[in-house]
Amino acid sequence: MLPRKVFFTKGVGRHTDPLVSFELALRDAGIEKFNLVTVSSIYPPYCEIVEAEKGLSELFPGQIVFCVMSRMTSNEQGKRIFASVGAAIPPDPSLNGYLTEYHGYCNGEDAGRHAEESAAYMLKTAFEIEPARTFNITVEADVEDCTTVVAAAVFVI
């Protein structure tokens, strides 16, 4: 199973119950209808990056869907949390790239940049090449009740 496409999405959910908070974050990201299976950090060769709407149009409710997901849940009122997925795409499409997850409490650091740089480092050290492109998808939120943030790279097989 080699994914043909990938899209990136993010969401925030708030509720008094952590599980419901997570569900609401998935809804906000548009991926609540799928049975999500998290995988590790490889961006597949020849994988096309598409807009979320296009990727979602090829998926069906209840489908098992693979993704790289960063997730953070907290009930520490007054804190700010983040979730980020960074990507490093190789110049040669026959090579794999890297996706990295990073999450935690905001501390002034550029979380998205950190995830992006981690992915770039993995690509550089795996193939001794510079990435053709790096980017990230990051979500931040102030904690109210129980808050969950999710960022995901979602694969379409």
UniProtKB/Swiss-Prot annotation:
NCBIfam families: PRK12398.1 (NF009064), pyruvoyl-dependent arginine decarboxylase (TIGR00286). Gene3D superfamilies: 3.30.60.30, Pyruvoyl-Dependent Histidine Decarboxylase, subunit B. This is Pyruvoyl-dependent arginine decarboxylase 1. InterPro entries: Pyr-dep_his/arg-deCO2ase, Pyr-dep_his/arg-deCO2ase_sand, Pyruvoyl-dep_arg_deCO2ase. The modification Pyruvic acid (Ser) is found at S41. Binds 1 pyruvoyl group covalently per subunit. It comes from Archaeoglobus fulgidus (strain ATCC 49558 / DSM 4304 / JCM 9628 / NBRC 100126 / VC-16). It holds the Pfam family PvlArgDC. GO terms for biological process: arginine catabolic process. Belongs to the PdaD family. It comes from the Archaea. The keyword Lyase applies. Its EC number is 4.1.1.19. Its cofactor is pyruvate. SUPFAM superfamilies: Pyruvoyl-dependent histidine and arginine decarboxylases. Keywords: Decarboxylase, Lyase, Pyruvate. The record marks S40, S41 as: Cleavage (non-hydrolytic). It is an enzyme of class 4 (lyase). It catalyses: L-arginine + H(+) = agmatine + CO2. One of its GO terms (molecular function) is arginine decarboxylase activity. Transmembrane segments: none annotated.
